[in-house]
Regions:
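Inter-motif core of Ras-like GTPase G domains
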Residues: 138-141, 155-176
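Hydrophobic positions on the alpha1 helix immediately C-terminal to the Walker A/P-loop
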Residues: 49
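NTP-binding/hydrolysis catalytic cores, primarily Walker-type P-loop NTPases
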Residues: 247-296
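Conserved C-terminal guanine-recognition region of P-loop GTPase G domains, centered on the G4
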Residues: 179-193
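Beta-strand-loop-alpha "switch" segments that mediate conformational coupling across diverse proteins
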Residues: 224-251, 263
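P-loop/Walker-type NTP enzyme "switch/lid" segment
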Residues: 39, 66-141, 238-249
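Extreme N-terminal, non-catalytic leader segments
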Residues: 1-44, 55, 62, 96-100
């Protein structure tokens, strides 16, 4: 377990020049890019992917902010081995600015922890949600990457964060229930003009992941008019379970494990993506972020 105190992070408030950060052999785009990891169903490995993806992005010196977007009952701090002194509830209650809640995680990433057991934070009201997204947009521009772990399901706060992000990553497993819930999530995102990238977790073979993605894309194309592109498959790997039990992310604890290799490949692909979808804080005004979520 790491130092339980929240460690102040020196973050300059001066405007930053666009810069490049090496990610493997790739050149990363302008600083301030954002990724939201979303799933329709709990238990598919979403938080684990968010944590390990953030650490993979930080491997070569990129400045990374990891946000626990499940404000009422998140677990990012647990998977990072942290016991933070503050969490997002201090900001939402008006006790400190958003940057004042940050803690230092593995590899020096900044972690914005969630509250634990605050049911009143499970769904934020519209003014609070607007303030949060504005402040998060300002904070994210001080980092090369912001990775947001969203709550499972299709609540208004989680969907607003998914639409806010430049790159929504939709995680599922081959389980039929997980696929059904992932499709419902893709449908809600499509209603706001967003097509997520698809990642299939816990596959036995790469061919299984490709087949899951093919069937998902066929259904989405027919009903939604747009198909999520497959951006990666993650194998069922005992290293992931052992690392979670030890509160030690698998890209750190088992860097050569197959699942760690695949997550680093996903990080590399994110760094070389030349066609981001754009977002509210990095591509113009998006008033639709604050509209009610349409019915599934």
């Amino acid at each position: 377990m790491r130092d339980p105190r929240t460690i102040p992070i020196p973050i300059s408030t001066a405007p930053r020049r666009p810069e490049s950060t090496r990610l493997g052999e790739a050149r990363q785009a302008v600083a301030g890019r954002t990724v939201a990891v979303v799933s329709g169903k709990g238990g598919v490995g979403k938080t684990s992917l968010a944590v390990n993806l953030a650490l993979a992005l930080a491997e070569n010196g990129a400045r990374v902010l990891l946000v626990d977007g499940d404000f009422a009952l998140g677990s990012v701090d647990v998977l990072c081995g942290l016991a933070p002194h503050r969490n997002v509830s201090a900001y939402l209650d008006g006790a400190c600015p958003l940057a004042g809640t940050l803690a230092v995680g593995p590899r020096g990433i900044a972690v914005l922890p969630s509250a634990s057991g605050r049911s009143d934070l499970s769904e934020l009201d519209s003014p609070t949600r607007t303030r949060l997204l504005e402040d998060l947009g300002t904070l994210s521009r001080r980092f090369d990457w912001t990775v947001v772990d969203l709550p499972s399901g299709i609540g208004s706060t989680g969907m607003a964060l998914a639409r806010w992000a430049e790159i929504p990553l939709l995680l599922t497993t081959p389980d039929p229930a997980a696929l059904l819930h992932a499709y419902a999530t893709a449908k809600l995102l499509a209603a706001r003009g967003r097509t997520p990238r698809l990642v299939v977790n816990r596959v036995r073979t790469e061919a299984e992941g490709a087949e899951v993605a093919r069937r998902f894309a066929r259904t989405a194309s027919f009903h939604l008019g747009a198909a999520p592109e497959l951006w990666g498959t993650l194998p069922e790997d005992p290293a992931a379970q052992r690392a979670a039990a030890d509160q030690d992310p698998f890209v750190v604890a088992a860097p050569r494990a197959p699942v760690s290799v695949r997550v680093r490949e996903l990080a590399h692909r994110l760094g070389t993506d030349e066609h981001p979808q754009g977002s509210a804080h990095a591509g113009g005004d998006r008033k639709d972020l604050f509209l009610p979520v349409p019915a599934a």
